[in-house]
């Protein structure tokens, strides 16, 4: 039986469109695997631990690039917990009328700025352990 926390993480990754491997992201973005890893370490791409590797939530990509404004939002979070960050990105916020990630995907500068302000405010505490 899978522990409750593991079930929640699987559901969260499913909600995020599934997880891509570093090789998948490398092909998608037309960059090397080393460049993918560097972007992850720099906080420009979100990756969640999956066994001894990482899964890159598919929702953070638009065609062959990362969602515009994503790296800015990840920097605003200042939380070194990828599962909490993923939950924040895909969970609808009443103030936005959508999830923070959906706000970025709408390419509306005011909505993007509001979502980034929420990311900064939410960085104070997350419920994942």
Where are these regions (language model features)?
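Non-transmembrane "mature" sequence context
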Residues: 1-129
